[in-house]
Amino acid sequence: MSYEIITYDPDTGTDEHGDYRTQREARQGLKLYRQEPAALIYDLDRWRIVYRRGYWPAGALPIERGCNA
């Protein structure tokens, strides 16, 4: 499995950070982005959001498998 951290700022939009092998590594890496208004951990293999914090407008969220786009 691989995970990615995606952050969101209303002024700059979304930004992708790193590739992590485990969800635990991704949660540790997320601590680096505490100052960001919103952040999430995205499972790249299953196309699912596994953790989300902060406000995300609908257009800024990544696509999830099994959800209507």
Which residue ranges define each predicted feature?
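Short aromatic-glycine-(Arg/Gly/Cys) micro-motifs in beta-strand/loop hairpins
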Residues: 1-16, 43-44, 49, 57
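Short, mixed-charge low-complexity intrinsically disordered segments
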Residues: 33-69
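Acidic interaction surfaces
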Residues: 8-23, 63-68
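Short, flexible N-terminal segments of the mature chain
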Residues: 17-35
